[in-house]
C-alpha cells in the first residue's frame, strides 16, 4: 500500500513513563519541590472532595453536582499561575483553581446544595460566580480583559470552557471581543 504522508511531531518531555527525569533544564517552578508537593496535595484534596461530593449527590444529599474528575491538575495549575488581582470567570467545575484562590469547600457544597450564598465565596471578591449555562463565562472574561486594557492595568482575566462550549455563540462572541482588543 502506498504511503500518503509521514511526519514527526516534536514534543517536550520532562518525565518518562516511570516518573524519572529525562531532562535537566526544568522550569523554575518545577525545581521548587516544596511548591510541587503543595500543588500535589491540593490536587489530591480536589480528587477526594470530588469523590465525596459525588457520593453526596448520588445519595440525594446534594443537588446537581458537576464533577471535576480528571481535571484536578489542569485546574490547580490555572489557580497557581494566576496573580491575586487577576480575575477568574469559572465554568462550573474548576474547584482546584478556586480552592487555590481561597474558595472554601463548604461554599462549593452550599452552592450545589441549592444555597446561592455559596456564590459569595471567600476567594478574591473580583472573581465571578459559577456559570452553569455553557460558555456564558467567556463573555464575562472578555469584558473584564477589555476593562483591564482600557484602564491600562497589568491584569489578566481567565476562563475555562469545555468542548461543547466552543460551539456556543458566547464563546465565539468572546473570541471576537478578544480579537478586536
Region annotations inferred by a language model:
Residues 5-8, 36-38, 81-83:
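A generic structural signal for short, non-catalytic loop/turn and secondary-structure boundary residues
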Residues 31-34, 44, 69, 100:
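Residue-level detector of secondary-structure boundary/capping sites
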Residues 33, 42, 130-134:
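Short acidic-aromatic active-site loops that bind/stabilize oxyanions
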Residues 48-51, 55-181:
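Cofactor-binding active-site loop characterized by glycine-rich and histidine/acidic residues
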Residues 1-28:
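Charged, compositionally biased N-terminal leader segments and the immediate start
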Residues 13-20, 41-54:
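N-terminal glycine-rich anion-binding loops that anchor highly charged ligand groups
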Residues 23-41:
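N-terminal cap/recognition module
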Amino acid at each position: 500500500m502506498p504511503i500518503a504522508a509521514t511526519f514527526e511531531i516534536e514534543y517536550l518531555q520532562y518525565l518518562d513513563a516511570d516518573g524519572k527525569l529525562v531532562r535537566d533544564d526544568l522550569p523554575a517552578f518545577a525545581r521548587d519541590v516544596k511548591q510541587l508537593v503543595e500543588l500535589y496535595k491540593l490536587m489530591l484534596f480536589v480528587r477526594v472532595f470530588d469523590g465525596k461530593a459525588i457520593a453526596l449527590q448520588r445519595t440525594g444529599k446534594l443537588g446537581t453536582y458537576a464533577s471535576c474528575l480528571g481535571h484536578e491538575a489542569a485546574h490547580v495549575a490555572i489557580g497557581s499561575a494566576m496573580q491575586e488581582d487577576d480575575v477568574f470567570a469559572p465554568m462550573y467545575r474548576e474547584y482546584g483553581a478556586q480552592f487555590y484562590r481561597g474558595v472554601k469547600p463548604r461554599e462549593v457544597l452550599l452552592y450545589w446544595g441549592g444555597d446561592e450564598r455559596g456564590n459569595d465565596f471567600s476567594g478574591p471578591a473580583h472573581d465571578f460566580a459559577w456559570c452553569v449555562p455553557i460558555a456564558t463565562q467567556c463573555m464575562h472574561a472578555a469584558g473584564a480583559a477589555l476593562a483591564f486594557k482600557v484602564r491600562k492595568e497589568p491584569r489578566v482575566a481567565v476562563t475555562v470552557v469545555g468542548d461543547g462550549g466552543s460551539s456556543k455563540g458566547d464563546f465565539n462572541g468572546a473570541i471576537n471581543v478578544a480579537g478586536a482588543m
